């Protein structure tokens, strides 16, 4: 009989329906309810992208396809997928409990975020491992980052090339690529968090692969807290690049995200587009990886490499 291996796929989570927004936001705020104004603001953002984010559906599809692919590409072990979310059910701890109940003793934990940070990957994997230790007889092997994975870089190289190939030579000369990820509080830099460096590296790899000379790194979707967050914000960066260099076409690659969701559909497709419209520039944003075969192949390689290194 083949050994069963747990595949713990972890992600941020998103409200499933409008009624979930308040409890979801309260969980993000560590139990503090949002003010009516804050709740209204977030609800309006969801309404602007069609009422609710497609993220829940995409995350589940990514996880199921990954499980299927892993069981197709090898015959030594049988992967069983469990989904664990940070801010809404099924919570990470629930997924680990279910895994334990199913008699799983070894699991590979993959966070659907390519870059490592203490705020994201470390906290997800930490929660999973803590729960596994409490339950006993279950080892969780966490994957730190996978932004250097050749198929991940290639996905974005192809996506960016696809946009540039549709431009005339004249437009291409005045175009700039903005590579971005979710901003985090600036204090992580003082703590030696590798997150900003990893995004810079990712941008270099993609620009080199897509043969794009004009590119910059930006940050987006900063939280509403008194702490300073890493910048420049993509909207400010857009204005600055237009003023300084006269760019008139902006290509946004939000590579810190793996799916279409609020941060991309609103913060990029709405907020950044407001800026490009204002300055009379063109707005482009490649398709997100979502559950595309190319992206699932990339994640398959990531999991297989981890499994081979620890088992």
UniProtKB/Swiss-Prot annotation:
CDD domains per record: Ferrochelatase_C, Ferrochelatase_N
Catalytic activity: Fe-coproporphyrin III + 2 H(+) = coproporphyrin III + Fe(2+)
Gene Ontology molecular function: ferrochelatase activity; metal ion binding
Compartments in which it is found: Cytoplasm
Binding-site list for Fe(2+): 182, 263
Family matches, as HAMAP family: Ferrochelatase
Protein name listed in UniProt: Coproporphyrin III ferrochelatase 1
């Amino acid at each position: 009989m083949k050994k069963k291996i747990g595949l713990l796929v972890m992600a941020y989570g998103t409200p499933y329906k409008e009624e979930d927004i308040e409890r979801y936001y309260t969980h993000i705020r560590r139990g503090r309810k949002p003010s009516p104004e804050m709740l209204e603001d977030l609800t309006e953002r969801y309404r602007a992208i069609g009422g609710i984010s497609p993220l829940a559906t995409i995350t589940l599809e990514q996880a199921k396809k990954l499980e299927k692919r892993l069981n197709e590409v090898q015959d030594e072990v049988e992967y069983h997928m469990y989904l664990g979310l940070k801010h809404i059910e099924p919570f990470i701890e629930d997924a680990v409990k279910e895994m334990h109940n199913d008699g799983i003793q070894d699991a590979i934990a993959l966070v659907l975020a390519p870059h490592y940070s203490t705020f994201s990957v470390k906290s997800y994997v930490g929660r999973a491992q803590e729960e596994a230790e409490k339950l006993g007889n279950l080892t969780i092997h966490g994957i730190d980052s996978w932004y250097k994975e050749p198929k991940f870089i290639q996905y974005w190289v192809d996506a960016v090339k696809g946009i540039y190939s549709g431009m005339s030579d004249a437009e291409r000369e005045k175009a700039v690529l903005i590579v971005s990820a979710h901003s985090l509080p600036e204090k992580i830099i003082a703590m030696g968090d590798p997150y900003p460096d990893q995004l810079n590296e990712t941008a270099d790899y993609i620009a080199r692969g897509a043969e794009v000379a004009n590119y910059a790194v930006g940050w987006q979707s900063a939280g509403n807290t008194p702490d300073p967050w890493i910048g420049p914000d993509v909207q400010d960066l857009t204005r600055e690049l237009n003023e300084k260099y006269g760019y008139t076409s902006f290509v946004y690659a939000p590579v810190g995200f793996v799916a279409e969701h609020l941060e991309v559909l609103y913060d990029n497709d709405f907020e950044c587009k407001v800026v490009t419209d204002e300055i009379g520039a063109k707005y482009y944003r490649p398709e997100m990886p979502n559950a595309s075969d190319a992206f699932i192949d990339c994640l398959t390689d990531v999991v297989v490499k981890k499994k081979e290194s620890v088992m």
